[in-house]
Each structure stands twice: as structure tokens, then as C-alpha cells.
A protein has these predicted regions:
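Alpha/propeptide regions of enzymes that mature by internal proteolysis
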Residues: 68, 114-118
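Glycine-rich phosphate-binding loops at beta-strand->alpha-helix junctions
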Residues: 92-110, 114
């Protein structure tokens, strides 16, 4: 997370990191208050999946939109983790927290498989 919860990884209803020009376009098209509502309450996994903000529900749904939302989340998790591992010049462990981190075993496994290059392995 950066200045606000809108930065960083995509969340249930928050966009995560987004190009500043996209925000300017949203403001031009929708106004400031509506844009704030869109980015904070109608984006993230909810917007990507077409209506589901909870990873548990996404994992139970076989739709292409839900699969895309999960793939997007895993991809950006890998990008963030990779940049942090590089900045720290390695790592000793990864701890998953929060609802997704604690309960979404499949999502954790997908992310960790993508970090095998850094010596990461799944330890359940």
C-alpha cells in the first residue's frame, strides 16, 4: 500500500495500482466523487469478475470472468513479490496474511510456484 489503500495489490473492491492517466480519464468522464466511488467500491476483484469481491466465491465460480480476476490477482502478487525480493536481495520466508492469505490455499500455491526461481517452496 502506498499513500492510500488504492495503491498496491488489487483488493476485493479497490482497484490497486492504476495508471494515473486512467484516473484522469475516469474523473473527466464521471466527476471526482463518482470516480472515488468507482475506484474504492466498484473495482478490484468485484469489477474484474463482474460481481464477486470474495476470493472464496471466485474460486467456486467456473466463469471466465472469475478465472480472470484470480489470474490478475496472482499475477500482480507475483510482480509485487518479485520486486520486493529483488530490492531486499533475497528472502528468508514469505508469510501470507488476511482472508486470502489464510484461506485460499490454491491461490497461495499459484503465487509460490511463480517464485520458485527465488528458492521459494510451499510448506503446508
Amino acid at each position: 500500500m502506498g499513500y492510500s489503500p488504492l495503491d498496491g495489490l488489487t483488493m476485493g473492491t479497490r482497484s490497486g495500482g492504476i495508471d494515473a492517466n486512467a484516473v484522469l480519464r475516469l474523473v473527466a468522464d464521471n466527476g471526482l466523487e463518482r470516480t472515488k466511488a468507482i475506484l474504492n467500491h466498484e473495482s478490484g476483484l468485484l469489477g474484474l469478475s463482474g460481481g464477486k469481491s470474495d476470493m472464496r466465491n471466485l474460486m467456486l465460480d467456473a466463469s471466465a470472468d472469475s478465472a480472470f480476476a484470480i489470474e490478475h490477482f496472482c499475477y500482480w502478487s507475483l510482480r509485487h513479490a518479485g520486486s520486493l525480493i529483488a530490492a531486499m536481495e533475497g528472502l528468508d520466508a514469505i508469510a501470507f496474511t488476511g482472508g486470502i492469505g489464510e484461506n485460499a490455499i490454491g491461490v497461495r500455491a499459484r503465487i509460490l510456484r511463480g517464485l520458485e526461481w527465488a528458492g521459494v517452496r510451499l510448506d503446508v
